[in-house]
Amino acid sequence: MTQLTKYLLFVFLCLSVIQLNAQQNDSITDTNLVTFKEVSYTLIGPVKKGMASFYSLKFEGRKTATGAIFSHAKYTAASNHFPLGIYVRVINPKNNKYVIVRINDRMGKSMSKKGRVVDLTRLAAKEIGIFKQGIGKVLVQKVEKQANK
């Protein structure tokens, strides 16, 4: 084999590896995107496993930790595991249904000790299928809204 043939073979192999790596990076990016209510979000960070419950009716109309007025008709949640103001995806692993909710409140300390990761609104709990039993196992992960294109 001549020097030129070896060199061309080396360049071809390098370009093949670069192309394969680019294809793998594209697929990773695609799997990190989720859509909820026609808005795209990027999944960020580790998944937190735990239990979810939903707020009692007595909290309707009260102020949350962020100062917002609580409503069971919104996609919000309380959590002691995530910062206030961020969005998270909450998945019910039994049926793979999920919601995106904004963390705008804190839970009572006793709820965290019981393994609760989030306390959802009734709307969110119904959407992922934990409303009837009142509590359910969930996977929770931080998300960020994608910029409008």
Could you say what each language-model-derived stretch is?
Residues 2-7, 21-149:
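Secreted/periplasmic proteins
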Residues 8-16:
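Bacterial N-terminal signal peptides
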